[in-house]
A protein has these predicted regions:
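Short, acidic/polar
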Residues: 5-15, 72, 156-166, 250-260
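Acidic (Asp/Glu)-rich catalytic clusters
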Residues: 13-17, 42-51, 73-83, 168-169, ...
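Conserved, mostly hydrophobic/aromatic
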Residues: 45, 76, 119, 154, ...
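Hydrophobic faces of well-ordered beta-strands that scaffold small-molecule active sites
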Residues: 1-3, 23-25, 53-57, 84-88, ...
Length: 301
């Protein structure tokens, strides 16, 4: 089981000591909500941990030059002794992210695909010559390479079929968010079908799910907290959909929902506790719920 890392370094260490398999950070450049920048906080997390996989969930890849991302991740992977995973997405929820970085929002898909291919090439440590739609390089070398052979795993995040196809073609894993178990199962089928169509073996592929969690002994309190938290983040009314897209309720309710995700094909959770008791929820999840649910972590090499 993995968790979104809290900002408090002592809680981060406590979660790792209690057996969190992975810890994740995400962020935006210029969203309406106050959020960190993913790569900066990933560097912080590398220094705060010793054993857990550390990753981004999510780095908005089209906002950044792929050579820079390749260099940053290679350096962090060596600093973390090969514990880094890279969760990437196209973004688009907030046009302000793209305005801030001078990137046309309509190019986010093509930039992401090209950048993913370039990351793999740069992580060999060999000179890269590339003439694509968005970037041109002649013999550009990013070195030394990451500690993990071939580079850290790239886990594709998203919700739509185009993201599923990206995962099937270019990713090492799939991590949707705001999904029900039923929708997750359908996404697994779609990715497998696309992989079969292109002749790709998914034996080493990691099936992840990013799940918001609001837990309380009072089910109504947990639900109210979740609706308020997600409504503030996504500027939407979650009152009708919260039970589908989050794990909400008593500890037993949350365990049942996560069990349903496991039945739908999830191998590794990235759980994001929300609400006023998020820190205590994180402790309870990693101490108690994880024992029956942790199915590995998204790394290779």
């Amino acid at each position: 089981m993995g968790l979104v890392a809290p900002s408090d370094r002592e809680i981060v260490r406590e979660l790792e000591d209690h057996g969190a398999a992975s810890l994740w950070v995400g962020g935006h450049v210029a969203s309406p909500n106050p959020t960190p920048e993913a790569m900066v906080w990933l560097a912080r997390l590398v220094e705060q941990t010793e054993r857990a996989i550390v990753g981004t969930a999510t780095l908005l890849l089209p906002l950044f030059p792929p050579a820079l991302v390749a260099k940053q991740i290679a350096d962090l992977d060596r600093a973390a002794a090969g514990r880094v995973a890279l969760g990437i997405g196209v973004g688009g929820e907030y046009a302000s992210d793209f305005d801030a970085c001078g990137i046309p929002i309509e190019e986010r898909g093509s930039r992401t695909n090209e950048a993913m291919e370039l990351l793999r090439a740069f992580w060999t440590g060999e000179p890269v010559t590339h003439h694509g739609r968005h970037w041109d390089f002649d013999g550009l070398r990013i070195h030394p390479p990451p500690q993990q052979s071939g580079g850290p795993p790239i886990v594709v995040t998203g919700r739509q079929p185009v993201a599923m196809r990206r995962a099937a073609r270019l990713g090492d894993g799939w991590m949707p968010y705001l999904y029900s178990p039923e929708r997750y199962a359908r996404s697994v089928a779609t990715i497998r079908e696309e992989a079969q169509r292109i002749g790709r073996d998914l034996d080493a592929f990691t099936w992840c799910a990013y799940v918001f969690v609001s837990m309380d002994d009072d089910r109504d309190v947990a639900r109210t907290n979740a609706v308020h938290a997600l409504g503030g983040t996504y500027r939407n009314d979650f009152s009708e959909m919260i039970d589908r897209v989050a794990a909400v309720g008593t500890p037993e309710d949350v365990t049942a929902k996560l069990d349903a995700f496991v039945g739908a094909g999830v191998e590794h959770f990235v759980l994001c506790p929300i609400g006023p008791n998020a820190a205590e929820n994180a402790r309870h999840l990693v101490r108690d719920v994880a024992r029956s649910l942790d199915r590995g972590s998204p790394t290779h090499g």
